[in-house]
Amino acid sequence: MHIDIFNGDADGICALIQLRLAEPQSAQLITGLKRDIQLLDRCSAQAGDCITVLDVSFQANSKRVDELLNQGAHIFYVDHHQPGTIPQHPHLTALIDTDNTVCTSLLVNRHLNGKYPLWAITAAFGDNLNHSAEQLAARLKLSQTQLDNLKNLGIAVNYNSYGSCISDLHFAPDTLYREMSAFQSPFDFISGNRAIFTQLTQGYQQDMANAQALTAEYR
């Protein structure tokens, strides 16, 4: 069995989209709110199972990682947060880089030799790594309109992951992943699933407008 565990924000979703475009795999999905960092506690695995973990703190899940490895699982772990001590184990592959210019999707883009950079750019914008996103976009010679669309998508998908419970969100992260992963590129998603793109971006814009109105009223 294959299990994909990923943060429900733009970085986690776009990282998994890249991997599954490159390596299609039927998998159990485990995800949650942006603040749900101990996602591996929800994972049950057996010897020989393959687990992919994306944009989830290694340090916060290190005990569970050890347990899963001892049960015979194989783990591929990609993240950009401080990991603590990473164990040496033949069944653990960890691609972890804590440089403040990278996010998990940029690491996956590097791992895949730049196969799906548009998804990495989207995630970088969502993680507020605007300079990194623009640097990668410059190599692709994107128009300003294209760049703006990727930025709007990244910000809106990232915002969708904030809430106290799944019902607070416009879309559950696993649902949003399934909708987005049906497309080769973010541009295909934006044009091919306009209803969800519009709901995401308008939901973000409306909430920001409401917040500004409350701030103005408070003053």
Feature locations, PLM:
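C-terminal accessory domains and tails appended to enzymatic cores
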Residues: 5-18, 24-42, 48, 138-219
